[in-house]
UniProtKB/Swiss-Prot annotation:
Belongs to the RNA methyltransferase TrmD family. This is tRNA (guanine-N(1)-)-methyltransferase. S-adenosyl-L-methionine binds at residues 113, 133-138. Coiled coil: none annotated. The gene is trmD. Keywords: Cytoplasm, Methyltransferase, S-adenosyl-L-methionine, Transferase, tRNA processing. GO terms for cellular component: cytosol. Homodimer. Its EC number is 2.1.1.228. It is an enzyme of class 2 (transferase).
Amino acid sequence: MWVGVISLFPEMFRSVTDFGVTSQAIKKGLLSIETWNPRDFTHDKHRTVDDRPYGGGPGMLMMVQPLRDAITAAREASPGKTKVIYLSPQGRTLNQAGVEELATNENLILICGRYEGVDERIIQSEVDEEWSIGDFVLTGGELPAMTLIDSVSRFVPGVLGDFASAEEDSFADGLLDCPHYTRPEVLDGKEVPSVLKSGNHKDIARWRMKQSLGRTWLRRPELLGNLALTDEQELLLAEFVREERQNSK
């Protein structure tokens, strides 16, 4: 996967390129990240990239010309058909389904806004999709872009040592993840559930599904409304709910 990033602060992306799973993916040649700074496309000595909005109001907007030229440069560098994304609070909220959808693209250009945003005509003429990471305000699009890169790159074949890790993560099947345990077997008097030490893979899978369903019911019940549970899942959830209510008495 190739990702081009348009940002006034390209140095921020070293946290993605130099560390963690994404860094390893780059070293393996599975992921490529290039950055373009609109300041490099200005024509004045101050390298101006912002201007006042028509109609007045607080704040500034990113100027059209440097931003458009940076996008053009990124398009020209892209190895193939490219989807251009603007990270924006007005965009579609990123969730696991959206991550998997974006992961089907081989090439992405991510535009990171600053100040009060960008000229609407840039969005209309240059942007294919707008995406948001939530209903809250940030100072720029860099952190959302890094979030998108991190989550999407997990679905690039070979990036994770075990692709099942991505498929079994929270939200991958619409549910929250089940609890996980490692050594020591007893910690502060609390033991690892015996089923996980049984070696019975069928029982372990059943326990994990039950816990996943139960945790979703407890913490994010609205997610269950979007799912068509199997008969077995319905039974497991009912069993969890019954036990939870008995334990709370």
